[in-house]
Amino acid sequence: MIQAETRLTVADNSGAKVLGCIKVLGGSKRRYASVGDIIVVSVKEAIPNSKVKKGDVMKAVIVRTKKEIRRPDGTYIRFDDNSAVLINATKEPIGTRIFGPVARELRAKRFMKIISLAPEVL
């Protein structure tokens, strides 16, 4: 469950290290986002000479959350961190590599490029 002001780690090699959630997209009253949802983020920390700079405002898709996700078969999955992947206007990842596992729910949301780049899909 990600909401405004939440800090997230970055699961790609775009150059950003820490993101801050500004807004959860999907209606003015929407408060929380989960895996596969798109949020507006600000880059809080970035490495030098990278594609993104500190203070950049962009969109990101959530790939891991600490809050467990209930699957249709009754099982739950949760991760050790809240992580996101930066995306461009066409919903393609900015980075060329994804680090760590990602949730299977991304496939239903049609983020196939992220699924194919990820080392493990849980």
Swiss-Prot record:
It comes from the Bacteria. GO terms for biological process: translation. Binds to 23S rRNA. Forms part of two intersubunit bridges in the 70S ribosome. GO terms for cellular component: cytosolic large ribosomal subunit. Part of the 50S ribosomal subunit. Forms a cluster with proteins L3 and L19. In the 70S ribosome, L14 and L19 interact and together make contacts with the 16S rRNA in bridges B5 and B8. Belongs to the universal ribosomal protein uL14 family. Keywords: Ribonucleoprotein, Ribosomal protein, RNA-binding, rRNA-binding. Coiled coil: none annotated. InterPro entries: Ribosomal_uL14, Ribosomal_uL14_bac-type, Ribosomal_uL14_CS, Ribosomal_uL14_sf. One of its GO terms (molecular function) is large ribosomal subunit rRNA binding. CDD domains: Ribosomal_uL14 (cd00337). The gene is rplN. This is Large ribosomal subunit protein uL14.
